[in-house]
């Protein structure tokens, strides 16, 4: 329903994860009977989680570890891992930068060009461990580097930018034709981000197997303040899910909706899937792992843009191992550990046994969900406080 912004402008009301609640149904289910797997092209993935293609979150070791746990780690092929043979010292420098110098320091570190040989080396390193090898490139550089990535054994390509559309217009060069490019590739492609029904639908029509949904919700992203663009995630995901339904009616093909950003706790992942997501791409929750390359830091991949940075470096507390954060066991009670356990139990409490079934769960607008009755927790900064 549209509301009046002013006499000359109307708009829709949109909702984030904190604005909504999942409603339990008349049936409950044993958590052990819940199947959280999903399909990405020809690949069956055990857990509906992808680690964001961010340098403080994923390096080859983390991608391998996540793959063995049942998820996916997306390596950024334009990041620090492909600019330096030994990125360790540069990651240490990023971690040591004072807040006032962080953006300038990142701009300097990322001034080094991407080295194609390192793209091949990193992909082969992950591939050698027998896990699904997934990596990202921007639309601006994907044609330049895709061949070396494919030759090294890339399994799934992610074409990712702040906002990616199927109809980019440019007067200064020939824009990437996504539909033609994807059709010519021998591997499945995920593309995004987007945050609206129409953009998601047109991206699905390019032949992508998945669409990333999220513009600016991430913990280290400042896009929404710098350019004022974005849509709260619950609404953005639900709109993309509507586009998926329309696309399926048109073609008979199912395209995955992947919620990208804005999730910190197990309940957030559950809400994303309840709104229509098939899987969740997360960054800051995994940046808190002891194995994360950020050394207790997390930064957006537009932070080092030379002209208009749209991200920041944030400090994250190391709260556990990658395994503990993803699948437990948890030793905290706020939902930041055992994310998949939180999702599994949400599905069980509502009586659903698959991801696609759980997308049908009832959701209501409930802005008091996280505060109702929680004054003691808030006053003591424990639990949900």
Can you describe what each PLM-predicted range is?
Residues 1-250, 286:
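Active-site entrance/lid segments in N-terminal catalytic domains of soluble metabolic enzymes
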Residues 1-26, 110-114, 118-124, 190, ...:
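Alpha/beta catalytic cores of nucleotide-metabolism and tRNA/nucleoside-modifying enzymes
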């Amino acid at each position: 329903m549209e509301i009046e912004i002013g006499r000359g402008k109307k708009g829709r009301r949109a909702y984030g994860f904190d604005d909504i609640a999942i409603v339990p149904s008349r049936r409950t289910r044993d958590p052990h009977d819940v199947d959280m797997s999903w399909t990405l092209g020809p690949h069956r993935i055990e857990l509906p989680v992808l680690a964001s293609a961010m340098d403080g979150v994923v390096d080859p070791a983390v991608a391998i570890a996540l793959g063995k746990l049942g998820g996916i780690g997306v390596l950024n092929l334009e990041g620090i891992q492909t600019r330096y043979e030994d990125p360790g010292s540069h990651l240490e420098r990023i971690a040591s930068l004072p807040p006032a110098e962080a953006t300038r320091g990142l701009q300097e570190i990322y001034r080094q060009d991407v080295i194609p040989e390192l793209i091949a080396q990193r992909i082969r390193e992950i591939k050698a461990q027998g896990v699904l090898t997934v990596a990202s490139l921007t639309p601006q550089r994907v044609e330049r580097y895709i061949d070396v990535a494919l030759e090294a054994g890339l399994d799934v390509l992610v074409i990712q930018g702040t906002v990616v559309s199927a109809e980019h217009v440019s007067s200064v060069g020939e824009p990437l034709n996504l539909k033609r490019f994807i059709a010519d590739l021998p591997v499945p492609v995920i593309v995004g981000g987007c945050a609206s029904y129409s953009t998601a639908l047109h991206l699905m029509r390019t032949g992508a197997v998945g669409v990333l949904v999220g513009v600016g919700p991430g913990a280290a992203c400042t896009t929404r303040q710098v350019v004022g663009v974005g849509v709260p995630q619950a609404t953005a995901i639900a709109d993309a899910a509507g586009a998926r339904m329309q696309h399926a009616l048109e073609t008979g093909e199912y395209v995955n909706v992947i919620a990208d950003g804005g999730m910190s706790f197990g309940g957030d992942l559950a809400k994303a899937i309840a709104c229509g997501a098939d899987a969740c791409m997360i960054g800051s929750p995994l940046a808190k792992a002891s194995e994360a390359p950020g050394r207790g830091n997390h930064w957006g991949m537009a932070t080092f843009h030379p002209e208009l940075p749209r991200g920041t470096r944030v400090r994250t507390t190391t709260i556990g191992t990658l395994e503990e954060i993803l699948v437990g066991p948890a030793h905290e009670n706020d939902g930041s550990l055992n994310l998949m356990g939180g999702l599994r139990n949400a599905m069980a409490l509502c009586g659903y046994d698959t991801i696609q079934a759980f997308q049908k769960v009832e959701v209501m607008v409930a802005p008091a969900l996280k505060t109702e009755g929680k004054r003691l927790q808030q006053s003591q900064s424990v639990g949900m406080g």
